[in-house]
Design a protein with these regions (language model features):
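Nudix hydrolase/Nudix homology domain
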Residues: 4-18, 67-68, 137-175
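Conserved Nudix-box catalytic region and its N-terminal flanking loop in Nudix hydrolases
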Residues: 53, 57-93
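Acidic, metal-coordinating catalytic segment for phosphate/diphosphate chemistry
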Residues: 2, 16-48
Length: 175
């Protein structure tokens, strides 16, 4: 069966040893490498929320599967916007409904988790919490803290972000 050649400009086409038109080797290699890079250099994306109450306290969670207090949030699913992921994760983890536009605070590379992982951190000031979910398989505890009085076992990345948000520390590109 003879398959048609890919649509290439005539200048990119070559001739095979038997005189038929062919696709140059470097074009094929380039296309294969592009597909390989798309598969192996996938980006993972997470959305986290620094939920701030009217007293200026921030809501943190303690997970069951990793140490330290952290911002609530999670991964962006395929076909989901970052805003939708943030809203979904905050509702699932801490029972918070976002009622106003969250402020994108920063985008951070998180190579400690995965080489191509990135976290988008939002400051959420317009919200309501009609219920506090019971501890479950994912979230062991949630609590509000004043930025200057966080627990000693806060995760390093969360501590750096709190300093950026509340103490005007220089922003980093890395979580």
């Amino acid at each position: 069966m003879h398959r048609p050649l890919p649509a290439l400009p005539l200048a990119k086409r070559g001739m095979s040893h038997n005189g038929e038109e062919s696709v140059p080797r470097d074009y094929i290699v380039k296309k294969l490498l592009q597909r390989y890079w798309r598969l192996t250099r996938a980006l993972t994306l997470g959305a986290q929320g620094a939920i701030v109450d009217p007293e200026g306290r921030v809501l943190l969670v303690r997970h069951t599967y990793q140490p330290g207090w952290r911002f609530p949030g999670g991964g962006v699913e395929k076909g989901e916007t970052v805003a939708a992921a943030l809203s979904r994760e905050l509702e699932e983890e801490v029972g918070v409904t976002v009622t106003g536009a969250p402020q994108l605070f920063g985008i951070y590379a998180n190579a400690a988790s995965f080489p191509n992982d990135h976290i988008l951190l939002f400051v959420v000031r317009s919200w309501r919490q009609e219920r506090v979910p019971d501890p479950n398989y994912e979230i062991a505890e949630q609590r509000f803290f004043t930025p200057g009085d966080v627990p000693g076992d806060i995760s390093a990345g969360t501590g750096r972000r709190l300093a950026e948000i509340f103490a005007s520390a220089p922003r980093s590109a890395f979580w």
